[in-house]
Regions:
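Serine-hydrolase catalytic machinery in alpha/beta-hydrolase-like enzymes
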Residues: 1-42, 140-154
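Short beta-strand/loop motif that positions the catalytic acidic residue
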Residues: 93, 99-101, 105
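Short alpha-helix in the alpha/beta-hydrolase fold that links the catalytic acid
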Residues: 95, 109-119
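C-terminal catalytic histidine-bearing segment of alpha/beta-hydrolase fold enzymes
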Residues: 125-177
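Primarily recognizes the serine-hydrolase "nucleophile elbow" in alpha/beta-hydrolase
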Residues: 24-94
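Acidic catalytic loop of the alpha/beta-hydrolase fold
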Residues: 104-108, 136
Length: 177
């Protein structure tokens, strides 16, 4: 497992209120990390999956749009938890993607992603799930169910977390060699 630390590499401690960050730039970091992993002898290169949360979720989706058509993808799949899609552009790739969103998300509203997803070409391998009572951070068990994050509300939702965990497990098991 590798975590792409897109904050400290840019001298930042968080992504809140930073116009210096966008999903496309971080998507390039994701692809660079995946390409690096492909060259490591201890890595099964055909099994590299990128998983991201919030801005990182938008980044793993943005990485799909940066894959050259003639190049084999270093990613077998991507999973995006409550992705931040404001900067996201439609992509065209065969790499399967799973997007898990909360209908009550005020930080990364699912409607923004849905507009992008509606522009994807037919045959794009995307599964999008929206959990009705879930907010941003629905899988973070350390959060209360209702917490302020700046002016937005975030919170843990046990039912959405359990459903998303099952969804991810099923999604990834279908992608195994």
């Amino acid at each position: 497992m590798v975590f792409v630390d897109y904050l400290s590499a840019r001298g930042l401690t968080n992504c809140r209120g930073s116009g210096a960050l966008n999903a496309a730039e971080i998507g390039r970091d994701v692809l660079a990390a995946a390409r690096y992993l492909q060259g490591q002898p201890y890595v099964k290169a055909s099994q590299i999956t990128a998983v991201g949360w919030s801005l990182g979720g938008g980044a793993v989706l943005a990485a799909l749009g940066q894959l050259p058509a003639a190049e084999a993808s270093p990613l077998r799949a991507v999973v995006a938890y409550y992705p931040y899609c404001r900067d996201l552009q439609p992509w065209q790739t065969k790499v399967p993607a799973l997007s898990l969103m909360g209908a009550q998300d005020e930080v990364a509203p699912p409607e923004v992603c849905q507009r992008v997803f509606a522009q994807l070409p037919p045959g794009t391998a995307l599964q999008a799930r929206i959990y009705p009572e879930a907010r941003h951070g629905f899988d973070v068990s350390d959060l209360p169910s209702y917490a302020k994050f700046g002016s937005e509300i975030v919170g843990y939702n046990a039912a959405a977390y359990a459903a998303a965990a099952r969804e991810v497990e099923q999604f990834l098991s279908r992608k195994s060699d």
